[in-house]
């Protein structure tokens, strides 16, 4: 049964993880086998599809009743921006969830800041369809 406060609980736990591992987040977390998982170390709690033939910087996670529903990765930088959008296009991704804090100094912008504004990355044209802001998070 879904609890009505599950989103708040996920956000609380995410904040707690970041606070507890402040300087070591994405750097020191290891798997049970003590092997690094690259930029996805913080997703150890999610069941991954390890047999997939994708780049190691991406991790596919199943949804409730849909296989490979979510594509998880770190925020792209200038060098990995095209690879990020290529993978999103290849996997037919329409929803992107960014767990890192949003501020005006994002490492590298990879989508439009305003609705209906177009962001271009080589042959890809990315349009922000909608945006909404709540107390704990921003939905774009």
Swiss-Prot record:
Ranges that cross the membrane: none
InterPro entries found in the cross-reference section: Prot-tyrosine_phosphatase-like (IPR029021), PTP_cat (IPR000242)
Tyrosine-protein phosphatase domain mapped to chain residues: 1-140
PROSITE patterns noted in UniProt: TYR_PHOSPHATASE_PTP
Coiled coil feature spans: none
GO molecular function terms attached to this record: protein tyrosine phosphatase activity
Family per record: Belongs to the protein-tyrosine phosphatase family.
Protein name (database record): Truncated tyrosine phosphatase D1
Species of provenance: Microplitis demolitor bracovirus (isolate Webb) (MdBV)
